[in-house]
Amino acid sequence: MRPASTTAGGVEIETLRVHSDERGSLFEPVDEPALAAQRNVHVVLTWPNAVRGNHYHREAWEVTTVFGPCLVRWRDADGLHDVDVPAGEAWRFRIPPGVAHAYRNTGTTAMVLVSFGSRPHDPSGGDTVSAAIL
């Protein structure tokens, strides 16, 4: 497991404690202080080698937790940043507005991604801007 938390390119990265036994694995995708600020949540299953994201938000912060394996990429003023989340680990990413982000499932089974947004979901895509980076 990597350091418990760090920041890279404006994105806060935190490794989470995963509890596993013969039944499966459990982790908390968002911490209590951040939970109160969230206005929507979605759970995403991503198939092997598929990519999700490829966008940024004009105003919203996004808190995304992935259960690896997964390649997480984001682009900020300093360029592209890549993080490989190992299989069986849960990592949380706090992504500020204006930072493009994307996720690729690098495994052989469905990847779980849980994402929280600081703004309510807008089906018209008002706060979400397409940005192909992966």
Task: Name each region found by the language model.
Residues H101:
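Glycine-centered loop/turn positions within well-structured domains
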Residues M1-R92, R104-L134:
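Non-catalytic, conserved peripheral segments adjacent to functional cores
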